Structure formats: structure tokens, C-alpha cells
Swiss-Prot record:
The keyword NAD does not apply. It comes from Nitrosococcus oceani (strain ATCC 19707 / BCRC 17464 / JCM 30415 / NCIMB 11848 / C-107). Belongs to the fluoride channel Fluc/FEX (TC 1.A.43) family. The keyword Membrane applies. GO terms for cellular component: plasma membrane. Na(+) is not transported, but it plays an essential structural role and its presence is essential for fluoride channel function. HAMAP family: FluC. Na(+) binds at residues 76, 79. This is Fluoride-specific ion channel FluC. The chain crosses the membrane at residues 6-26, 36-56, 68-88, 97-117. One of its GO terms (molecular function) is metal ion binding. It catalyses: fluoride(in) = fluoride(out).
């Protein structure tokens, strides 16, 4: 158990550092007028999440344990948007249109509200 937690933590550190480096690089190249770094990180994270899932699930090229460590540790730290998109794609793949809509609209709305609340509360304190 502890060994698995250590691997997840190590993968998480790698994801965090990768996000910081890639996002910063893209922002420096594209300018700070729009969050292109976040877009690139989230897009790449979604792509990698789907690829890793398929390699483990459909082609059996990655073991379930390695997949768990990479998706939970690295991708969890690199971007949680990849998990969000994957969950939405599963609803769509299963033709659960209402659940997909609730998930997509709800998560985005909740995120915006939470960011606004955090910003507002931090100004009051």
C-alpha cells in the first residue's frame, strides 16, 4: 500500500512540474492576453488520458496498476480537466445525454462560481 502511494506521489510531482513548465512555456510564447498555457495543458491532458486509458483497456499494453498510478498521480496533478472530459465522454458514449449535459454544465458552472466566491471572499478577508 505504501509503495503504491509513493508511486502516486512521485507521479503527481512529475505532473505538477510538467504542468508548470509547459503552461509557462506556452504563455511566454503566446503572450499573457489569453490563458493559452491552460488550454494546451488541458487539451494535452485529455489527449493523454484517452490514449493511456485505451492502451491499458483495449490493447493491454499498460497494466491496470500502472494506468492507475499514471492517471491518478501524473494526470491528476497535470490536469483534472482530463478526468472531467473523460467522465463526460463516458456519459456520451453510453448515450446518457441528460447526465452528460448535467455534468458538463454543472461542473463548469460550479467551477466558475467557486472561483468567483474564492476571489470575492479573499478580498473581504
Amino acid at each position: 500500500m505504501w509503495q503504491k502511494l509513493a508511486w502516486i506521489a512521485l507521479a503527481g510531482a512529475g505532473g505538477t512540474l510538467s504542468r508548470y513548465a509547459l503552461s509557462g512555456l506556452v504563455q511566454n510564447l503566446c503572450g499573457a492576453s489569453f490563458p493559452w498555457g491552460t488550454w494546451v495543458v488541458n487539451g494535452l491532458g485529455c489527449f493523454l488520458f484517452g490514449m493511456i486509458w485505451a492502451l491499458a483497456e483495449e490493447r493491454l499494453l499498460i497494466t491496470g496498476e500502472i494506468r492507475f498510478i499514471v492517471l491518478t498521480g501524473f494526470m491528476g496533478a497535470f490536469t483534472t480537466f482530463s478526468t472531467f472530459a473523460f467522465e463526460a465522454s463516458q456519459f456520451l458514449r453510453d448515450s446518457e445525454w441528460l447526465l452528460a449535459a448535467i455534468h458538463l454544465i454543472g461542473q463548469n458552472s460550479l467551477g466558475l462560481v467557486c472561483v468567483f466566491l474564492g476571489f470575492t471572499i479573499s478580498q473581504i478577508i
